[in-house]
């Protein structure tokens, strides 16, 4: 099948899957923002817990990305026994990841939330919500792994079905558990947390069934979960940059929360906008998850033409998606503010929408670059782009701009401009890396 058609066929389900993943957080915030009492504090609490939620997803998805690329390459080489070991070791890693999240949920959440706020109501809500999400995190972790196993064998439609089921369960349960309907008592933010984790578990269970029944290219057996240091090293050689890339997103949001601690309304507005931004950029992440196995498979076959087609169409489709995202966020910022019932944060939220959305085009291209790098074993280049986007440029710029905002010399909107500036610089560096990779790995 031609690469352009294959990318559409594989990409659409993945894009929908990633977009629906972002729906979990958007739906929670929308329902929480419309609570009768304490909605402002609740929205602020969800903003503060968001970095840890992203970190859990980052580790799960990053491990899955490494598994995805390695599994696709191994199957391309016709090695079904190693493919079974790759799948089994990914599940072993999932168990380890869950244990870490469980321990943090029991012992670490209060200290984490306390570092970002002194408001007792926000602290109580944040701790309650995050503890539930961490202690019952096995759903999101194993969903992320099963999703990538299905995607690696070209069955991305089934991973999307699982995501849809989880999203629907979450949306149905949110109003029931947050507001209290029928015999279910009103639980507020705790209800939002329970609705989220139940939706994640529903997705994971369904994908487990699909994995066992449909992925026949390799054997399924508990014996393949026995840890193999070589395979784990290969998984993380590919997946670690993806983990770091998304973990850096968590660090960035956490530090931005600290930077804007001087203005809780702006802090909340940034958290709300980030969920909208995540929805848009997850379109690029979804397409990246099609770009990576397509190019990785072609790289394993040594097909220069298919590698170059994968790069070309991956970038073209990403740019088209990001232009659509910019149009929606620039035209309808007020509608999103109303959805979240943003209250005192409304003006800050709209200004963030207007400015930061300008960065989407360059951010999407950077995400596509990273998918290309990972497919051809150029994980270091992917890591450098992540560091530039999420740490090296953005945080110093935001810190400097916040100094002017705190002093009253400029408005909070100045901080938002750090995002477009950062993405443009990272995109230029990414283009240099791409030219070098084409010369040394594709055309050589």
Name these PLM-found stretches.
Residues 9, 32-54, 121-125, 189-190, ...:
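Interfacial/gating helices of multi-pass transporter permease domains
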Residues 9-28, 132, 166, 199-203, ...:
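Transmembrane helical elements of multi-pass membrane transporters/channels
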Residues 19, 23-44, 113-120, 176-187, ...:
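Helix-terminus/linker motif at the lipid-water interface of multi-pass membrane proteins
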Residues 43-103, 140-159, 269-333, 363-377, ...:
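Small-residue-rich hydrophobic transmembrane alpha-helices
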Residues 64, 133-151, 159-167, 192-207, ...:
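Short runs within selected transmembrane alpha-helices of multi-pass transporters and secretion channels
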């Amino acid at each position: 099948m031609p690469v352009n058609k294959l990318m559409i066929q594989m990409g659409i389900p993945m894009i929908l899957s990633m977009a629906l993943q972002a729906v979990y957080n958007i739906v929670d915030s929308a329902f929480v923002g419309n609570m009768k009492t304490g909605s402002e504090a609740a929205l602020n609490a969800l903003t503060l817990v968001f970095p840890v939620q992203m970190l859990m997803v980052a580790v799960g998805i990053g491990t899955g990305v490494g598994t995805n690329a390695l599994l696709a390459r191994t199957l391309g080489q016709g090695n079904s026994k190693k493919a079974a070991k790759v799948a089994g070791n990914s599940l072993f890693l999932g168990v380890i990841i869950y244990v870490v999240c469980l321990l943090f949920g029991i012992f670490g959440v209060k200290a984490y939330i306390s570092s970002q706020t002194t408001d007792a109501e926000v602290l109580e809500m944040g701790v309650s919500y995050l503890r539930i999400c961490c202690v019952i995190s096995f759903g999101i972790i194993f969903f992320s792994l099963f999703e990538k196993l299905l995607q690696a064998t070209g069955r991305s439609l089934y991973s999307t079905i699982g995501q849809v089921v989880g999203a629907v369960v979450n949306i149905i349960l949110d109003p029931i558990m947050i507001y209290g309907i029928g015999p279910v008592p009103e639980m507020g933010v705790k209800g939002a947390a329970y609705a989220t984790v139940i939706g994640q578990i529903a997705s994971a269970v369904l994908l487990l069934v699909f994995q066992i029944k449909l992925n026949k290219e390799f054997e399924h057996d508990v014996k393949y979960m026995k840890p193999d240091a070589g395979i784990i090293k290969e998984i993380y050689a590919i997946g670690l940059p993806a983990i770091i890339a998304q973990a850096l997103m968590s660090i960035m949001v956490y530090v931005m929360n600290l930077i804007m601690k001087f203005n809780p309304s702006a802090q909340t507005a940034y958290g709300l906008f980030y969920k909208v931004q995540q929805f848009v950029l997850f379109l690029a992440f979804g397409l990246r998850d099609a770009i990576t196995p397509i190019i990785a498979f072609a790289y394993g076959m040594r097909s220069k033409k298919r590698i170059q087609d994968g790069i070309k169409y991956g970038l073209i489709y990403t740019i088209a998606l990001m232009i659509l995202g910019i149009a929606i966020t620039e035209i309808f910022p007020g509608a999103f503010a109303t959805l979240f019932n943003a209250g005192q944060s409304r003006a800050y939220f709209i200004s963030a929408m207007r400015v930061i959305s300008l960065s989407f085009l360059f951010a999407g291209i950077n995400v596509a670059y990273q998918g290309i790098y990972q497919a051809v074993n150029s994980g270091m280049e992917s890591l450098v782009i992540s560091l530039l986007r999420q740490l090296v440029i953005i945080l110093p710029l935001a810190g400097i701009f916040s100094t002017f905002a705190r002093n009253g010399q400029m408005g909070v909107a100045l901080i938002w401009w750090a995002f477009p500036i950062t993405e443009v610089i990272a995109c230029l560096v990414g283009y240099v890396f791409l030219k070098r990779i084409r010369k040394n790995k594709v055309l050589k």
